[in-house]
Regions:
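Helix-turn-helix repeat elements of alpha-solenoid scaffolds
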Residues: 36-51, 72-84, 112-148, 170-180, ...
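Flexible helix-coil transition and linker loops at the boundaries of alpha-helical arrays
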Residues: 57-61, 85-92, 126-161, 185, ...
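Alpha-helical junction/boundary sensor with strong preference for TPR arrays
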Residues: 92-93, 127-128, 191-192, 215, ...
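Generic helix N-cap/helix-start motif at coil->alpha-helix transitions
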Residues: 22-24, 28-36, 59-70, 93-100, ...
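C-terminal non-catalytic interaction modules
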Residues: 4, 271-320
């Protein structure tokens, strides 16, 4: 199924448990605070920020794990260089798929998006041994990948099919491969983060009708849905559906706890809608009609003024 064949909304997630954490709207202030916090954490002996992220503490390796499991464990949790995972993939072919995927996630975290694309695609194309799959189920469930699903909007995702494909899509987007980035998300189950990523990409590609269909019925329940409503409003505006776009922006502004950055975007977009409506109403034909009306009013005004002067002169004559 291709990206354009989904017949309805794609943001409704019916699962009881999902791999997604709370989304975050990034601002310059937050980025500075996180940078300072990371430096302090490193000075105090915390986990190196360049390593794979983990929710909580790193899982302990079981007793007598075997040479392969120990080597891969160390390459994942005690390493900041994707090359070490690539070396492990070459040394242990049955674990190659897992090693390449983890190397790709590490490269993605470090901002090496072109390399992340190559490693993730290669890892996804290789079948793992049962031992590698068991290792992933035992040790990788708390690995977290922070993915930018739209501009300034990040979501933490636990290790899963969704974390891998969202990271791949983000990396493709960062390397200018927008079509491929959208295609990478096609087979993922419906969810709000995936819907935001897909709609942001579709909007960039000018697929506004798809965005409108995919977001039909969306309400502002959190910042992710507010960000998605902004994308919806912009697509509707480009389609000329200004009334629907206005409703989407009103929904963004309805919830008081909506991120201030998103509220400001909504206010800006609402002003642009008003400007669009003004331009639409002031087309050249309207200007010509209004100009003729103004000229008529000017003639009437002058006639009334002359009549008043004439009446005033008669009153003065009568007084004499």
């Amino acid at each position: 199924m291709t990206a354009g064949q989904i017949p309805g909304p794609i943001f409704r997630d019916s699962r009881d448990l999902t791999p997604f954490g709370a989304g975050q709207v990034r601002t310059p202030v937050k980025e500075i605070a996180e940078g300072v916090g990371g430096l302090i954490h490193g000075v105090l002996g915390g986990r190196d920020s360049a390593r794979i992220s983990v929710d909580g503490s790193v899982p302990r390796l079981r007793l007598l794990p075997g040479k392969t499991a120990k080597a891969v464990y160390d390459a994942i949790f005690a390493n900041t260089d994707p090359n070490r995972l690539i070396a492990a993939a070459r040394e242990y072919p049955g674990w190659a798929g897992l090693c390449y995927v983890m190397a790709g996630l590490l490269a993605h975290k470090q901002g090496g998006y072109l390399r992340a694309v190559e490693l993730l695609q290669r890892g996804l194309s290789i079948r793992n041994d049962d031992d590698a799959n068991q290792f992933a189920a035992s040790y990788l469930t708390r690995v977290v990948t922070r993915v930018e699903v739209a501009e300034r909007v990040e979501v933490p995702v636990l290790f899963s099919e969704e974390s891998v494909f969202l990271a791949l899509s983000h990396s493709l987007r960062e390397t200018g491969q927008t079509e491929a980035a959208l295609e990478a998300l096609t087979m993922l189950p419906p969810s709000l983060p995936t819907a935001l990523a897909r709609c942001a990409l579709a909007y960039t590609l000018g697929r506004d009708q798809e965005v409108a269909v995919w977001t039909e019925g969306l309400l502002n329940a959190d910042d992710l849905s507010a960000a998605l409503l902004l994308v919806r409003a912009r697509s509707l505006r480009r389609l000329g559906a200004h009334e629907q776009a206005q409703r989407a922006l009103k929904e963004v502004l309805r919830r008081r706890r909506t991120s201030m950055a998103l509220r400001n975007d909504a206010l800006t977009d609402r002003a642009l809608l008003v400007l669009d409506n003004g331009r639409k109403s002031l087309n050249p034909r309207d200007w010509r009609r209004r100009r003729a009306e103004l000229e008529t009013f000017e003639v009437i005004r002058k006639d009334v003024q002359e009549r008043r002067l004439w009446e005033q002169e008669w009153k003065e004559l009568d007084g004499d």
